[in-house]
């Protein structure tokens, strides 16, 4: 199984670290440098556009003062010094803004209602606007649910004839534009449950022009990494750092030195490798960092992957826990005449061995395990899910039967996830209720009708989710948030910690991402968050990387095309272009691989950049492993 392979690789890396620890005196002065960066959010990490606050102007009315305050609240310099100019002296001295930020779309969408009292010496301004998102104290950016709103009150008073704020909320209110300017989206990295693969935990970090941005971010990233994952991701991941571990972080001219305290110094080599991996992957997102030194309680430690003083971030040691969840160049798999073919990175096609490629059993949907040793298929003729080895003597074995199965996905542990559509059963049950006698002995027709309508008001389960581990009975996945929601697609992340689902009808719906939590004998999906909110419809989705989806969707104006969607929850979906002359029907993606799309003309197109899609092969429903 995949998990076993990764655990072996991790053990090898630990052994390397143990050898390196024995020779710490060989560490180059100043620490190793970073090479082979990858992953994470780089972009505008090391740049900053400073807001020049206007400050309160003489003669401003109540509305104008609060509006100006909200604009200047986007300046984080000197602990919101500009925003405090709008307050009374007493208020400015005691106001302590919280780490929670409420995000609204734009100032034009904000409503100000003014009530002036006490002979125009005191006033109250009520501020209301739709809530776009919340940045939680742990840094997570959480998109708002439909109908959520900001509704806060500012108390004003006159000071020397000018309005000033005397009382206000502790929560920061920022426009989306302010968030884009002040915050940097980055990842913290933790491990999945068997410590085989790193998992990104997207966070938003505020920056200020008063201190070197890389210095700010490196210190904040390490502190947050040691504090633990966001509340949302915490139940699904693990950390190598012992509880209570603290660190000092020093940055100078591209060199970061992290000194972990005695708790980390007592860790065994395997755990020490994990701590190093989490730090390396987290810090290498910052492009200004050229050298990294790790100390344990003051003693310098050599890290795996160091060659001539250069830390190779893409070395075998670090790649053993790569967040991508897979290494090398995986093949894609597609259907042609109901049989399975493979397509390698050079676009050479081949009929796969065994029953999947040469047998007489035709499949409707398919998914290939991450190690490319097994294929799962949905059989349209007998309502079953079957699995076959991808080998010359590989034959299909039925693993699930008797349902209307619609979607398949493999995780890195070798588990197969299956979506079962219960809508036909629900519709039949409702028809039977309609045909049933409205009355029972002692009932009135009105009473029984009201009772039936009450029963229907409860959510009926229209989707059932299954988890199939090798050589084990199927387990029904507990997903209460999806109980009454039709799920048309489910894709589990390759690290096994999150799922992306497509909800709605056959014409497209909403993208949600939830966490995967394993109990002793149960599996549950929890805390779903919306993604790709700028798309009016989405018809297919795939994991492109550990922190990004590829989807087929449509904006309010435009045709169906490919988009890239970040899991950090903010910003607009990025266009990945469209196939010319043919409607796109499916999409699949994998880390470092071209996007592939199946079209209405039973051809598969490929794209390595956003501007050009090329026809690759004849076939339908291409998928990468996963």
Curated annotation (Swiss-Prot):
Which GO cellular component term is one of those annotated? plasma membrane
Covalently attached lipid (S-diacylglycerol cysteine), positions: 24
List keywords of the entry alphabetically: Cell membrane, Lipoprotein, Membrane, Palmitate, Signal
Give residue spans, biased composition: Acidic residues: 430-441
Species per Swiss-Prot/TrEMBL record:
Thermobifida fusca (strain YX)
Chain residues carrying a lipid of type N-palmitoyl cysteine: 24
The signal peptide stretch is: 1-23
Topology versus the membrane: Lipid-anchor
Q: Where in the cell is it found?
A: Cell membrane
Protein name as annotated? Lipoprotein LpqB
* UniProt-annotated stretches for the region Disordered: 428-457
User: So what family is this one in?
Assistant: Belongs to the LpqB lipoprotein family.
């Amino acid at each position: 199984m995949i998990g076993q392979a990764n655990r072996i690789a991790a053990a090898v890396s630990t052994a390397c670290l143990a050898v390196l620890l024995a020779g710490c005196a060989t560490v180059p002065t100043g620490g190793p440098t970073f090479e082979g960066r990858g992953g994470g959010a780089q972009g505008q990490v090391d740049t900053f556009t400073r807001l020049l606050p206007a400050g309160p102007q003489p003669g401003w009315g109540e509305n104008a003062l609060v509006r100006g305050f909200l604009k200047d609240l986007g300046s984080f310099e000197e602990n919101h010094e500009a925003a405090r100019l709008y307050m009374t002296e007493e208020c400015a001295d005691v106001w302590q803004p919280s780490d929670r930020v409420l995000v609204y779309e734009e100032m034009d969408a904000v409503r100000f209602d003014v009530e002036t009292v006490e002979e125009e010496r005191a006033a109250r301004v009520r501020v209301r606007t739709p809530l776009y998102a919340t940045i939680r104290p742990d840094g997570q950016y959480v998109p708002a649910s439909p109908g959520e709103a900001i509704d806060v009150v500012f108390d004003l008073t006159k000071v020397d004839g000018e309005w000033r704020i005397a009382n206000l909320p502790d929560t920061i209110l920022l426009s989306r534009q302010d968030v884009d300017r002040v915050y940097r989206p980055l990842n913290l990295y933790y491990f999945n449950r068997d410590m085989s693969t790193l998992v990104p935990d997207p966070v938003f970090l505020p920056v200020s022009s008063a201190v070197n941005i890389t210095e700010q971010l490196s210190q904040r990233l390490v502190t947050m990494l040691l504090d633990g994952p966001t509340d949302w991701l915490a139940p699904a991941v693990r950390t190598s750092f012992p509880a209570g571990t603290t660190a000092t972080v020093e940055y100078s001219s591209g060199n970061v030195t992290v000194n972990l305290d005695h708790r980390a110094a007592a860790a065994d080599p395997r755990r020490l490798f994990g701590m190093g991996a989490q730090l390396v992957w987290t810090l290498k997102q910052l492009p200004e960092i050229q050298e990294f030194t790790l100390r344990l309680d003051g003693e310098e430690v050599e890290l795996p992957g160091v060659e001539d003083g250069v830390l190779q971030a893409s070395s075998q040691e670090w790649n053993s826990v790569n967040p991508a969840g897979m290494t090398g160049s995986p093949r894609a798999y597609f259907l042609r005449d109901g049989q399975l073919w493979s397509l390698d990175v050079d676009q050479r096609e081949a009929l796969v061995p065994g029953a999947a490629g040469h047998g007489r059993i035709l499949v409707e949907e398919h998914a290939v395990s991450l190690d490319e040793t097994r294929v799962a298929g949905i059989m349209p003729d007998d309502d079953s899910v079957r699995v076959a080895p991808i080998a010359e003597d590989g034959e299909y074995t039925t693993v699930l039967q008797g349902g209307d199965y619609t979607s398949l996905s493999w995780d890195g542990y070798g588990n197969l996830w299956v979506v079962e559509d219960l809508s036909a059963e629900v519709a039949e049950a409702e028809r039977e209720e309609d045909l049933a006698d409205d009355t029972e002995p002692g009932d009135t027709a009105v009473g029984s009708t009201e009772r039936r309508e009450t029963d229907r008001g409860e959510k009926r389960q229209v989707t059932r989710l299954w988890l199939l581990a090798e050589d084990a009975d199927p387990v029904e996945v507990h997903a209460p948030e999806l109980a009454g929601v039709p799920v048309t697609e489910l894709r589990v992340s390759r690290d096994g910690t999150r799922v992306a689902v497509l909800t709605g009808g056959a014409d497209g719906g909403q993208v949600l991402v939830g966490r995967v939590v394993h109990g002793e004998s149960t599996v549950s999906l929890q805390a779903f968050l919306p993604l790709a909110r700028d798309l009016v419809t989405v018809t297919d989705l795939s994991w492109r990387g550990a922190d990004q989806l590829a989807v087929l969707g449509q904006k309010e104006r435009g045709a169906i095309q490919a988009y890239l969607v970040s899991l950090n929850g903010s910003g607009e979906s990025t266009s990945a272009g469209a196939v010319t002359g043919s409607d796109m029907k499916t999409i699949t993606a994998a880390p470092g691989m071209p996007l592939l799309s199946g079209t209405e003309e039973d051809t598969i197109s490929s794209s390595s950049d956003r501007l050009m899609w090329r026809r690759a092969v004849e076939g339908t429903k291409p998928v990468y492993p996963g």
